[in-house]
Amino acid sequence: MNIASQIEDMGRRARAAGRRLAAASPAAKAGALDHLATLLEQRQDAILAANAADLAAAAEAGMDAPRMDRLRLTPATIAEMAAACRHVAALPDPVGAIETQWQRPNGLLVGKMRIPLGVIAMIYESRPNVTIDSAILCLKAGNAVILRGGSEAIHSNLALAALITEALSSVGLPAEAVQVVSTTDRAVIAELCKLEEHIDVIIPRGGETLIRAVVDMARMPVLKHYKGVCHAYIDRGADLAQAVEIIHNAKVQRPGVCNALEGLLVHRDEAAAFLPAIAERLGNDGVEFRACPASLPLLGDSAIPMKDEDNGQEFHDLILLVRIVDDMDEALAHIAAYGSNHTEIICTRDHGNAMRFLREADASMVAVNASSRFNDGGQLGLGAEIGISTSKLHSYGPMGVQELTTTKFVVFGAGQIRQ
C-alpha cells in the first residue's frame, strides 16, 4: 500500500472510530485514561529503551542540545505523563453538556451543546510526551486523532502508541480512535493535508518551517502552534529583586521550550539598578545577552551588541535580547512589532499599568509578576494541552479538553411552527 492509500485508510478508520467515540460514555473514556496511566508506570523500562534508541540516533546525527532536551524521556517525565492521564480522566466530561439555555417568546427553549470537533490530525516534532498529551485530550473530548510525530522520536512514539491501543481496547473503545503514523516519510504530511473528507482540523506543532508548510498545504482548518517569541517588560518602580527571579526562571529553567523568555525590555529609570543584577544572576548560568547600545555597558562580559535580526528571534538557547525603553508605549510597540502572540509578561507595582498591559499586549497569555513558563496547559489547570494556539480562531492559548470541542444549537419545542 502506497503512502497516499495508507493515509486515506487511516483517515477513513479514524472517521468511523470518531463516530463511536463521540457516543462513548464518560466512564469508558475515563477508564481508558486511568488504564493508560497504569501502563505507562508498568512499562517504563520499555519506554525508556525505545527513547534511548531515538536519543542515540539523534546524537549520531548531530542534533543540538535544545532539541535533544525536548526528545529525552526520563522516569520523571513518564510519571508526569501518567499523572496527566489521571488528571484528565478526572476532569468533567464536556461532551453533551448544554452550557447555556434561553427561552424564546414562542416558548422554544434554545441551548448550546458541547460536541467533539471530529477527527484531528496532529503533526509535531521531537517531543514524545506530545503523543500522550494529544491522545488523552482528544479521547476525553470525544475526538479521533491521527498523530504524526517527528522521525527523530519514532521509536518512542510507537512504544507509546502500543500502550494507547491497549488502554482503548481494555474498555471496548475502538483502537483506531488514536492512530500513530508508523512511517517517517515526510510525504505523509502532504497526504494528511489533503484529507478534508476525513479530517476536520489539523494542528501543527513545531518549527516555523513546518507550520508554514502545513498552512500552505492544508485543505481543512489549521490551528497554529506558532513560535514563542516571549517578552518581559520591567516597569518603572517594579520590585526588582522579584523581577530578577522571574526573568531567571523564564529564561534559564528550560531555554529550548516555546514559553521561555526571548526578549527583556527595561524601563530606562530601572536599567542602572536592574541590568547588573540580571547580568550576575543569569550570567552565572551561561546566558549570553544580545544588548542594545544603552544596555551593553550595564551587562558586563556576557553581553554582545545586538543585531537587527535578533529582534523577533526565537533563540531556543541561553540567549536573551535586552533593550532599554523609554516607557510602556515603546515596550508595547516593540512587542507588537516582534512578538509572536504567544506570551508576554510585565513586572510592575502599578495596578493601572498592569491592567493596561493585560489589555494591550497581544498574546495568548499575558501575565503580571509571573514567569512566562506558566503558559502551559498543566500549569493553568487544564490537565494537559495539545498545544498553545497562537491563532485567535477557534482557540487562543493552551488547548485543553474544552478547546477540543465546539458547540451546536439544540432546540426543545412543544409543537411550535414558524409563522
From Swiss-Prot:
The keyword Transmembrane helix does not apply. It is an enzyme of class 1 (oxidoreductase). Gene3D superfamilies: Aldehyde Dehydrogenase, Chain A, domain 1, Aldehyde Dehydrogenase, Chain A, domain 2. One of its GO terms (cellular component) is cytoplasm. It catalyses: L-glutamate 5-semialdehyde + phosphate + NADP(+) = L-glutamyl 5-phosphate + NADPH + H(+). One of its GO terms (biological process) is L-proline biosynthetic process. Its main location: cytoplasm. It is found in: Cytoplasm. Keywords: Amino-acid biosynthesis, Cytoplasm, NADP, Oxidoreductase, Proline biosynthesis. PROSITE patterns: PROA. Its EC number is 1.2.1.41. Pathway: Amino-acid biosynthesis; L-proline biosynthesis; L-glutamate 5-semialdehyde from L-glutamate: step 2/2. It comes from the Bacteria. GO terms for molecular function: glutamate-5-semialdehyde dehydrogenase activity; NADP binding. Belongs to the gamma-glutamyl phosphate reductase family. Catalyzes the NADPH-dependent reduction of L-glutamate 5-phosphate into L-glutamate 5-semialdehyde and phosphate. The product spontaneously undergoes cyclization to form 1-pyrroline-5-carboxylate. This is Gamma-glutamyl phosphate reductase. The lineage of its organism: Bacteria, Pseudomonadati, Thermodesulfobacteriota, Desulfovibrionia, Desulfovibrionales.
